[in-house]
Amino acid sequence: MKRFIAAILCVGLIAAVTAGCGYKDALSKENKATQATEATGSSATADEPKPADFKDNLEGLISYFTELEYLAMKDGKLDESTVTVMDASLIGAKEGKKFITAYGGKAITIELYEYDLKNLNDTAKTVVESVKNSGEFTILDLPSVKAYLSDDEKYLLIYTDSSIDDEKPDENSDNYKHREEVIENFRKF
């Protein structure tokens, strides 16, 4: 009976130690994410990646977002299991991908699309013009989608974080600040 109790205590101790390590790792990731959010603007570090360091295409934008750690990572690289290739033709784009990630413990969806500026079809022109004018677009009979264009209008971002109330956002929340940072860096690309 003493051995049985000792075995249960050992298993409990191992579980507590293992969970404790995971908890510290999670805190470390959250702390790093918070530090990254606080490092925006003029106080950003010199080693922060710059858009000019990446190819001017969708894969370059994805690499840029990966370097900034906006997308889900696994073993220091983009976690491909979180990536979905989208039917970009629905919005007239050349190609697009959707990424499932998280920030502040909340699920986030990031969709990135690339347009061929020399060959915009009518759908692309309509979507781009709508996003420029109102910050959103509609396709088919679906509800409107909030979206952002890069400064050169070559790329489109759809950023979805259900923890942010778009009607009355808490501008002091970490998730709101993170979204604004992502949008700011996206627009520069």
Predicted regions and their residues:
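A short acidic-to-branched-hydrophobic micro-motif
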Residues: 101-122
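C-terminal motif of bacterial Sec signal peptides marking the signal peptidase cleavage site
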Residues: 16-20
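A short, solvent-exposed beta-edge/loop patch
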Residues: 135-189
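Positively charged n-region of N-terminal signal peptides that target proteins for export
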Residues: 1-9
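Short, surface-exposed beta-strand/loop micro-motifs that present aromatic residues
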Residues: 93-104, 142-151
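N-terminal "mature-domain start" segment
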Residues: 22-95, 169-189
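Second-shell loop/turn segments in exported
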Residues: 46-52, 109-115, 159-173
